[in-house]
């Protein structure tokens, strides 16, 4: 049985865009580099040729990976979700109980998780601690530096 990959509609669109870029822009550019490098003669000592072939291999591998993830995608339109209980797709505002610092995280699938963009994987320790909780609740998360406590200040669906 094929395992579905949960993702937001935004995450699906981002993967689709990357796939199109790799297929229609990167692939032809790499093929052109290979042809140009091949024209320089002896391939056994042609570093430019080997680098282009390696880039082609990497690109084709990523294309296959993207096609697989898109084929198995279980797209969830977060804007149609609601409720006070935190689940996949929720955007959660947390207050660190030690520092009073506010942070905002959206709980997404592993494929689209990116901490720099405020998106955490549903399988992360923080997301696992948040799932099923409501605004006003305090959660404790085991972090590399020890346990951290956060108050759930807001739950949004956007």
UniProtKB/Swiss-Prot annotation:
One of its GO terms (molecular function) is DNA binding. The keyword Isomerase does not apply. GO terms for biological process: DNA-templated transcription elongation; regulation of DNA-templated transcription elongation. Residues 47-74 form a coiled coil. InterPro entries: GreA/GreB_C_sf, TF_GreA/GreB_CS, Tscrpt_elong_fac_GreA, Tscrpt_elong_fac_GreA/B, Tscrpt_elong_fac_GreA/B_C, Tscrpt_elong_fac_GreA/B_fam, Tscrpt_elong_fac_GreA/B_N, Tscrpt_elong_fac_GreA/B_N_sf. The keyword RNA-binding does not apply. Keywords: Coiled coil, DNA-binding, Transcription, Transcription regulation. Belongs to the GreA/GreB family. Necessary for efficient RNA polymerase transcription elongation past template-encoded arresting sites. The arresting sites in DNA have the property of trapping a certain fraction of elongating RNA polymerases that pass through, resulting in locked ternary complexes. Cleavage of the nascent transcript by cleavage factors such as GreA or GreB allows the resumption of elongation from the new 3'terminus. GreA releases sequences of 2 to 3 nucleotides. NCBIfam families: greA, PRK00226.1-2, PRK00226.1-4, PRK00226.1-5. This is Transcription elongation factor GreA. It comes from Bradyrhizobium sp. (strain BTAi1 / ATCC BAA-1182). The lineage of its organism: Bacteria, Pseudomonadati, Pseudomonadota, Alphaproteobacteria, Hyphomicrobiales. The gene is greA.
């Amino acid at each position: 049985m094929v395992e579905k990959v949960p993702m937001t509609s935004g995450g699906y669109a981002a993967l689709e865009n990357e796939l199109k870029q790799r297929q229609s822009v990167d692939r032809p550019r790499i093929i052109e580099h290979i042809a140009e490098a091949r024209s320089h003669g002896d391939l056994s000592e042609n570093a430019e040729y080997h680098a282009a072939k390696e880039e082609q291999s990497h690109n084709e591998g990523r294309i296959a990976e993207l096609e697989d993830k898109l084929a198995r995608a279980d797209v969830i339109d977060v804007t149609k979700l609601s409720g006070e209980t935190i689940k996949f797709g929720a955007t959660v505002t947390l207050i660190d109980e030690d520092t009073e610092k506010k942070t905002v995280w959206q709980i997404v699938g592993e494929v689209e998780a990116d901490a720099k963009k405020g998106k955490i994987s549903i399988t992360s320790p923080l997301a696992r601690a948040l799932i099923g909780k409501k605004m006003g609740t305090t959660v404790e998360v085991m972090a590399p530096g020890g346990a951290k406590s956060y108050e759930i200040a807001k739950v949004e669906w956007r």
